[in-house]
């Protein structure tokens, strides 16, 4: 049976896919058999291709996501346009199948955490059904504090277990980035567990800290 983690983003274009790929790459370097999962994708599944490139994995793309849409839109819109609405049962079955092939599953979220998957289903409902602990990925630049605090507060209010924050596009020694890190920890009570700089090809994180995210 696999152990699993959900990667939430504070919004689109914060580098969620890239960071997820680095997490999987790091786990595999430690000898962990790690698979990737995402409930829905738009843009004909380009996220899966990016993950494979960053993480260096050979997982079959057909197993990485049960709902791959051509329409570039939120899942509930894409599902309506393409007449293929999302079913929670289909997602759970697909996730369980991946869990039979890998010891660790890293699931990437769609857009931000407050993301409607259908009229009746929110992203958080999927995370809750699958019983996943979570981390938050955010851009370390302007707007970081607001987006992280709002995301963490929402997730905690919804009884989602947030185990850490990863700041992307971080610049060591930059006062704004350093202060954003400090204030995110202070205001949320959630630790920043890693900083990713532009051009990083490996995730700098303590091995025990990484493995504890999945515990």
Roles of regions detected by a PLM:
Residues 13, 22-23, 42, 110-189, ...:
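Conserved catalytic-core segment of NTP-binding enzymes
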Residues 91, 98-118:
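Switch II (G3) loop of P-loop NTPases
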Residues 181-215:
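NTP-dependent small-molecule kinase module
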């Amino acid at each position: 049976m696999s152990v699993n983690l959900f990667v939430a983003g504070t919004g689109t274009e914060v580098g969620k896919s890239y960071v997820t790929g680095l997490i999987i790459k790091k786990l595999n370097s430690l000898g962990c058999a790690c698979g990737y999962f995402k409930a829905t994708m738009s843009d004909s599944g380009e996220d899966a291709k990016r993950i494979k490139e960053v993480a260096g994995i050979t997982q079959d793309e057909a197993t990485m996501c049960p709902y791959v849409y051509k329409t570039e839109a939120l899942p509930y819109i894409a599902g309506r346009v393409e007449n293929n609405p999302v079913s929670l049962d289909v997602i759970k079955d697909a996730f369980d199948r991946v869990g039979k092939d890998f010891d660790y599953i890293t699931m990437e979220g769609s857009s931000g955490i407050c993301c409607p998957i259908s009229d009746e289903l929110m992203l958080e409902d999927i995370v809750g059904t699958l019983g996943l602990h979570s981390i938050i990925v955010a851009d370390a630049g302007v707007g970081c504090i607001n987006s992280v605090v709002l995301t963490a507060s929402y997730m905690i209010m919804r009884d989602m277990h947030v185990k850490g924050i990863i700041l992307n596009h971080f610049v060591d020694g930059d006062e704004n980035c350093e202060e954003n890190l400090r204030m995110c920890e202070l205001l949320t009570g959630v630790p920043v567990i890693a900083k990713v700089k532009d051009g990083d090809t490996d995730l700098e994180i303590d091995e025990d800290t990484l493995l504890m995210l999945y515990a």
